[in-house]
């Protein structure tokens, strides 16, 4: 009796598992399909030689990412491991997506990237929906040391990079951050004598610095605020940029993607490029300029630049500085912008005498539609500074 009961229990358990397994089994092929759909909207494509599923983990083997069928645009990235994959209303969430170290070589160029991964990845159920939920998101994308070698010599490297994305609770705003720490550039391999002379004089043979980007995107009005886009190069200076535009909505993005697809699908390249240009011109009509700013904080490059230019012209640095200060008002006068002429001249004089920082800002009293800017550029270029509220300052 006990044996019969045990046997019935085992049969019942097996039946339950048999019926339950398909409902809970993870479909690795569908995960890849949904990921590919999200990338395809952006003009990219992912292929894998095989897909293996083990519990809530998926392994994609022989992965290649690229655009179209052109072999030149295909980039093999090896195996990709997806950990903690869960189905979510037709889409998927992935705790961590890990990539093999990149070791790519073609002709004279070799690229290596270590410690690549993404966390908090959200794969949309329907990448064609015209909502923010149709986009592929991640909490963090990370790379470790990366290097580019040309003819066996390292030309560029980065110690580490991190990119993060954060969605507000109501889904109305997306914030983003990007840092690339410890990048290095080696220009010692330049062979052209004149260029090599300039690089040596400007002390640019070896460059090192950091890149920082952060901002936000308000989805409904399509307002992109890039609060900081800075490149800080040691012994050269720090370039800071920021801007804000509106109109970059989901509808705008879809129209832009459709234009790109149409361009790629047209075999007549000249005709495709012309149609794409007209499409972009039309889309620009939907954008609005809010503000922008660009500034440079000097760390020695200005003086070295003046010294080198003076030597090339057979004069002294002091004489060249005076020439620059004298020429600035005349050059600005040719643009017929009297309200900006004095400000530019004063800023140039101040900066050349004591290079600290130089800033150009555009802050109109109210947002300016791009068509108005384009109209001013074609009809009355000298009115653009007043239309955009341009100011120029130095050492402030």
Stretch-by-stretch model annotation:
Residues 1-25, 362:
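Gram-negative bacterial Sec-dependent N-terminal signal peptides
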Residues 26-396:
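Glycine-rich, small/hydroxylated-residue low-complexity segments
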């Amino acid at each position: 009796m006990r044996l019969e009961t045990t046997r019935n229990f085992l049969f019942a358990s097996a039946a339950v598992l048999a019926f339950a397994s398909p409902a809970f089994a993870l479909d690795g092929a569908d995960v890849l399909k949904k990921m590919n759909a999200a990338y395809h909207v952006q003009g990219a494509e992912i292929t894998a030689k095989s897909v293996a599923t083990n519990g809530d983990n998926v392994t994609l083997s022989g992965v290649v990412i690229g655009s179209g069928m052109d072999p030149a645009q295909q980039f093999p990235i090896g195996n990709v491991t997806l950990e903690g994959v869960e189905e979510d209303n037709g889409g998927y969430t992935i705790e961590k997506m890990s990539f093999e170290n990149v070791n790519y070589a073609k002709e004279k160029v070799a690229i290596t990237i270590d410690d690549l991964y993404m966390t908090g990845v959200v794969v949309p159920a329907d990448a064609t929906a015209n909502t923010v939920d149709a986009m592929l998101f991640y909490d963090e994308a990370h790379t470790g040391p990366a290097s580019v070698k040309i003819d066996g010599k390292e030309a560029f490297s980065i110690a580490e990079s991190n990119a993060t994305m954060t969605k507000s609770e109501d889904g109305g705003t997306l914030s983003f951050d990007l840092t690339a720490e410890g990048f290095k550039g080696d220009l010692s391999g330049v062979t052209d004598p004149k260029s090599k002379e300039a690089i040596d004089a400007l002390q640019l043979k070896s460059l090192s610095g950091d890149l920082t980007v952060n901002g936000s995107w308000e989805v409904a009005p399509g307002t992109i605020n890039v609060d900081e886009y800075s490149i800080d190069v040691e012994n050269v200076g720090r370039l800071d940029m920021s801007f804000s535009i509106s109109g970059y909505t989901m509808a705008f993005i879809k129209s832009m993607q459709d234009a790109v697809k149409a361009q790629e699908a047209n075999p007549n390249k000249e005709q495709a490029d012309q149609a794409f240009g007209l499409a972009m011109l039309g889309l620009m009509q939907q954008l609005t300029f809010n503000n922008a700013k660009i500034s440079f904080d000097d760390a020695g490059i200005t003086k070295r630049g003046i010294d080198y230019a003076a030597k090339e012209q057979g004069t002294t640095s002091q004489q060249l500085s005076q020439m620059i200060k004298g020429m600035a008002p005349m050059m600005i006068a040719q643009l017929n912008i009297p309200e900006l002429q004095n400000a530019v001249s004063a800023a140039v004089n101040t900066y050349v005498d004591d290079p600290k920082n130089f800033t150009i800002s555009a802050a109109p009293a109210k947002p300016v539609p791009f068509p108005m800017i384009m109209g001013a550029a074609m009809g009355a270029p000298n009115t653009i500074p007043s239309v955009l509220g341009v100011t120029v300052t130095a050492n402030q």
